[in-house]
UniProtKB/Swiss-Prot annotation:
Gene3D superfamilies reported in the protein's UniProt record: 3.40.140.20, Methylglyoxal synthase-like domain
MGS-like domain mapped to chain residues: 1-145
UniProt keyword annotations, A-Z: Hydrolase, Multifunctional enzyme, Purine biosynthesis, Transferase
Protein name in the entry: Bifunctional purine biosynthesis protein PurH
A Pfam family: MGS
SUPFAM superfamilies (alphabetical): Cytidine deaminase-like, Methylglyoxal synthase-like
Entry-linked SMART domains: AICARFT_IMPCHas, MGS
Superkingdom of this protein's organism: Bacteria
Source organism of the structure: Prochlorococcus marinus (strain AS9601)
Pathway: Purine metabolism; IMP biosynthesis via de novo pathway; 5-formamido-1-(5-phospho-D-ribosyl)imidazole-4-carboxamide from 5-amino-1-(5-phospho-D-ribosyl)imidazole-4-carboxamide (10-formyl THF route): step 1/1; Purine metabolism; IMP biosynthesis via de novo pathway; IMP from 5-formamido-1-(5-phospho-D-ribosyl)imidazole-4-carboxamide: step 1/1
One of the GO biological process terms: 'de novo' IMP biosynthetic process
Length: 517
């Protein structure tokens, strides 16, 4: 008896050559319905229509096609079970040996901004049911949910009877496919109706097995979406991305995005930004009127730490910038675009990873941030809400000048991306000292101020958290700091304010904290 394949696919990629191979080389009969049946018939592939197979028409506008005992009985029947054999004979069931199903494009529909009613109609019911039935009975039935599986199935079939391990692998992929589908639906409903879910469920396909994790003895895997973020970035040259590369690229790009992002010359004057990052902390950042100046200014902050670092730009990288980039050892450079001349110059650095990621490939704001803890997961909103300077308060007798305000704004944006406790010293739209990841705030201030040294005169200081004491103001004054920006909110705020007033320092409270752990 010829084997029977049930074929119902939304994505029809390679389905015609696959079904032709099934029919011509393996003597399969094809059972299908709706658009898939029409597609196969037009390609001269013989098809048994589901309605004829079940003797039941499609009803409810196509909502019910394959939800029938003859379909699911033919899939779920255990071939060696005597009771099942009796049911098969009593109900005149024909056994289905292969299920080839992929689902209505729900993600694509909702990503395109579909109305609620249209999205609901794109929730597949029959497809997941057939997939799950076949996956449950994978010992007797093979299930394919993606066109990438077709060729391997044909190759395995040519070897003879399919191995149990191969069919179990197909079942795993099938259940993951339906789990991913249900996750997309539940998350869409949660977001559309602004509901708090009692369960946190996300689904990401495996992008790549990484060489190792944070350290060589740790295994690591990269999961993600194929059409957004780093997986959609174009790597123009260089070695494969490592686990640490990806972490640092994420931090570098997140920082530079504070200042706009475009591959075209659409940025306002002096809004071209460059950030150099090492071990998940900025070690230099600058805004200028060109990418080359921004990079060189950022490099001046800490050229020692920049060695082996990551560089991010918020605008096009030209040949002048590339000349400076090739003079230092770097792991990665990321930007929205690169001139051909720039890429030619950077070719000499064969191991340098160059990534191009456009504005359209960036994820939307207001996503979730997650961290693993023992026995669970912490979930929070990402700290990417727009900074509203109208909420800032000048709390000292002396108000900052317009130029000082520009530097305060710049320093505050960089400080947000430095590990807590964080202090950033800036002057003329560039960092001149950064104190990161210290257990006390005054310790971070000492590191940043010492790094900046004599350049601190008329510079500004940003702190990601409030001052518990006036000691940070006191040491800042010793170095010549002229303005301070911090969240405020300490019980001893007045002591810091009084210290600023006595030293002629202006201070601004943002009323928003930016801890980063």
């Amino acid at each position: 008896m010829s084997p029977l394949a049930l074929v119902s696919v939304s994505d029809k990629k390679n389905i015609i050559p696959f079904c032709k191979e099934l029919v011509e080389h393996f003597n399969y009969k094809i059972l299908s319905s709706g658009g898939t049946a029409k597609h196969l018939i037009e390609a001269k592939i013989p098809v048994i229509k589901v309605a004829d197979f079940t003797n039941s028409p499609e009803i409810l506008g196509g909502r019910v096609k394959t939800l029938h005992p003859k379909i699911h009985g033919g899939i779920l029947a255990i071939r060696t079970d005597e009771e099942h054999k009796k049911d098969i004979e009593a109900n005149n069931l024909e056994l289905i040996d292969l299920v080839v199903v992929n689902l209505y494009p729900f993600k694509k529909t909702v990503d395109g901004g579909a109305k609620w009613e249209d999205a609901i109609e794109n929730i597949d019911i029959g497809g997941p049911s057939m997939i799950r039935s076949a996956a449950k009975n994978h010992k007797d039935v093979s299930v394919l949910v993606d066109s990438s599986q077709y060729q391997s199935f044909l190759e395995e079939s040519k070897k003879g009877e399919l191995k149990d391990s191969y069919k179990a692998k197909l079942a795993l992929e099938a259940f993951q496919h339906t789990a991913d589908y249900d996750t997309a639906i539940s998350n869409w409903i949660r977001k559309e109706r602004d509901l708090q879910s009692s369960k946190y469920i996300e689904s990401y396909p495996l992008i790549k097995t990484l060489r190792y994790g944070e350290n060589p003895h740790q295994k690591a895997f990269w999961y993600g979406l194929s059409n957004i973020g780093w997986n959609s970035a174009e790597q123009l040259q260089g070695k494969d991305l490592s686990y640490n590369n990806l972490l640092d690229l994420e931090s570098a790009l997140s920082t530079v995005l504070e200042f706009g992002y475009t591959e075209k010359d659409e940025l306002a004057t002096d809004m071209v930004a460059s950030v150099i990052l090492k071990h998940n902390n900025p070690c230099g950042a600058s805004m200028s009127n060109s990418a080359s100046k921004a990079f060189l200014n950022a490099l001046e902050c800490d050229s020692v730490s920049a060695f082996g670092g990551i560089v991010a730009f918020n605008s096009n990288v030209d040949s002048e910038t590339a000349i400076h980039l090739k003079d230092i050892f770097l792991e990665c450079v990321v930007a929205p675009s690169f001139d051909e001349e720039a890429l030619e110059i950077l070719k000499v650095k064969k191991n340098l990873r160059i990534l191009k990621i456009s504005k359209d490939q960036l994820p939307q704001k207001n996503q979730n941030s997650t961290k693993s803890i023992m026995g669970g997961l912490l979930v929070q909103d990402t700290d990417d809400s727009e900074e509203k300077t109208e909420n800032w308060i000048s709390v000292t007798n002396k108000n900052p000048s317009n130029q000082i305000n520009l530097d305060l704004n710049f320093a505050w944006k960089i400080c947000k991306h430095v590990k807590s406790n964080a202090i950033v010293i800036a002057k003329d739209q560039k960092t001149i000292g950064i104190g990161a990841g210290q257990m006390n705030r005054v310790g971070a201030a000492k590191i940043a101020l010492k790094a900046a040294g004599r350049l601190c005169s008329d510079a500004v200081l940003a702190s990601d958290g409030f001052f518990p004491f006036a000691d940070t103001v006191e040491i800042a004054n010793e170095y010549g700091i002229k303005a301070i920006i911090q969240p405020g909110g300490s019980l001893r705020d007045q002591e810091s304010i009084d210290m600023c007033n006595s030293k002629g320092i202006s201070m601004v409270f943002t009323q928003k904290r930016h801890f980063l752990h």
